[in-house]
Amino acid sequence: MPKIVGTGNYTYEVNEEWAQLPEGWDMPAASVFGDSQDRVFCFNRSPDHHIVIFDREGNYLHHWDAGSFTFAHAIFIDHEGMVWLIDRDIGQVFKYTPEGQLLLTIGTRDYQSDTGIAEISSSLAHTVVRPGEPFN
């Protein structure tokens, strides 16, 4: 019997064989997000390929590296298709094009906020807000 995760209208069947990686690659995915073109972006804790992109069937399309991350934490793709990444340990949020060009960095590397929010990386929803389900 397949493993089902999620609740309500948002349930998914787990497929351990879905991602078709290039030979010899490891992909310790920290966060996954799908875009409007049915591509799946995986933000990984690998020093060699931070962002790996697949089609909806799990076929590898391409990848890009996103600088120097210490702890990949979250990915979000906004309504314009821009890719937002959070590194939990360095306390920064980054905005990239879908092709991997850095557009914006929020926060100072290795400096945690003293505003009462424990980490800038606590939630990507604090950074990017859009109307829609299921999260905002």
Name each model feature, range by range.
Residues 1-136:
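Eukaryotic scaffold repeat domains enriched in small/polar residues
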